[in-house]
Amino acid sequence: MSFVVIIPARFSSTRLPGKPLVDINGKPMIVHVLERARESGAERIIVATDHEDVARAVEAAGGEVCMTRADHQSGTERLAEVVEKCGFSDDTVIVNVQGDEPMIPAVIIRQVAENLAQRQVGMATLAVPIHSAEEAFNPNAVKVVLDAEGYALYFSRATIPWDRDRFAKSLETVGDTCLRHLGIYGYRAGFIRRYVSWQPSQLEHIEMLEQLRVLWYGEKIHVAVAKAVPGTGVDTADDLERVRAEMR
């Protein structure tokens, strides 16, 4: 099947300045992400960035770049600019791969594209089971609950679903009911155009989760269990050192 990967790569980062260009074992991080995307079999891969240094690094690795504005409030807004500049048809399947995921398995990039292509829905994503209490109660681990058909009912930083009887006895085990959302999305290009036309929702501001805008406006998001678990993403200097060690 045919799909396009877009990798948003914003240069500024409060916790890790110049993040796309940090060195991981001899290569800029954004080049590692580009290589994982190539392994997925995508028809076209575009790095969307607001900085010339990132563009030069990608082009030196043989990648395609789309320069975008620096004032976007979200990665989805940056995607929308690329969709318009490249003139993608409304039914084009686009996978948004985060630019700080150098260890993302190529198989899940393709998985989210295939899941979307098989359904009459505008957006798809992935999740993995949560097995530790630490992760279940961590607000940085976003949880998702699904309906019987695998569509998202809600995303939250809170522990959902709340296992009343189990947690009344102990908060040290979580059972097998919690799912952690992964930050990879598949969209149809026409859906991205609609998404950015909607006003931000109250829920996305409360939880700071932009995917809640989709549910707020009554649209569906399909969620599948990922075929592989992504490695560590890079948000901080500590994450960077961990990834360098894991990728040696």
UniProtKB/Swiss-Prot annotation:
Coiled-coil region: none
User: Hey, what's the signal peptide range on this chain?
Assistant: none
Q: Which CDD domains match?
A: CMP-KDO-Synthetase
Q: Where in the cell is it found?
A: Cytoplasm
Please identify the protein, giving its name as recorded: 3-deoxy-manno-octulosonate cytidylyltransferase
SUPFAM superfamilies for the chain: Nucleotide-diphospho-sugar transferases
Q: What is its main location?
A: cytoplasm
Q: What is the lineage of its organism?
A: Bacteria, Pseudomonadati, Pseudomonadota, Gammaproteobacteria, Enterobacterales
Q: Under the GO molecular function aspect, what terms does this record hold?
A: 3-deoxy-manno-octulosonate cytidylyltransferase activity
